[in-house]
Amino acid sequence: MATKTIESSSRSGPRRTGVGSLLKPLNSEYGKVAPGWGTTPLMGVAMALFAIFLSIILEIYNSSVLLDGISIN
């Protein structure tokens, strides 16, 4: 066979580490969703501002609307 299964009876369970003990409280909230809209409006505002920022950068790159009145030597 191409695959080989090795069963080890020496492992009794997951190993405890210092980092794991520190991060366990953060993982205890996994899967829980706060009721209501939460921070969705804030994310919407951030996305709108980012879209405006990208459009300004694109206009500068294309030398279109923002740079019409500026002469470049």
From Swiss-Prot:
Family annotation (Pfam families): PsbH
Biased composition (Polar residues): 1-12
Location within or outside the cell: Plastid, Chloroplast thylakoid membrane
Any one of the GO CC terms: chloroplast thylakoid membrane
PTM notes: Phosphorylation is a light-dependent reaction catalyzed by a membrane-bound kinase; phosphorylation occurs on Thr residue(s) in the N-terminus of the protein.
Record-annotated membrane-spanning stretches: 41-61
UniProt keywords, alphabetically: Chloroplast, Membrane, Phosphoprotein, Photosynthesis, Photosystem II, Plastid, Thylakoid, Transmembrane, Transmembrane helix
GO molecular function: phosphate ion binding
Topology of this chain in the membrane: Single-pass membrane protein
Keyword Secreted among UniProt keywords: no
Role this protein plays: One of the components of the core complex of photosystem II (PSII), required for its stability and/or assembly. PSII is a light-driven water:plastoquinone oxidoreductase that uses light energy to abstract electrons from H(2)O, generating O(2) and a proton gradient subsequently used for ATP formation. It consists of a core antenna complex that captures photons, and an electron transfer chain that converts photonic excitation into a charge separation.
Subunit structure: PSII is composed of 1 copy each of membrane proteins PsbA, PsbB, PsbC, PsbD, PsbE, PsbF, PsbH, PsbI, PsbJ, PsbK, PsbL, PsbM, PsbT, PsbX, PsbY, PsbZ, Psb30/Ycf12, at least 3 peripheral proteins of the oxygen-evolving complex and a large number of cofactors. It forms dimeric complexes.
The protein's name: Photosystem II reaction center protein H
Organism (species): Phalaenopsis aphrodite subsp. formosana
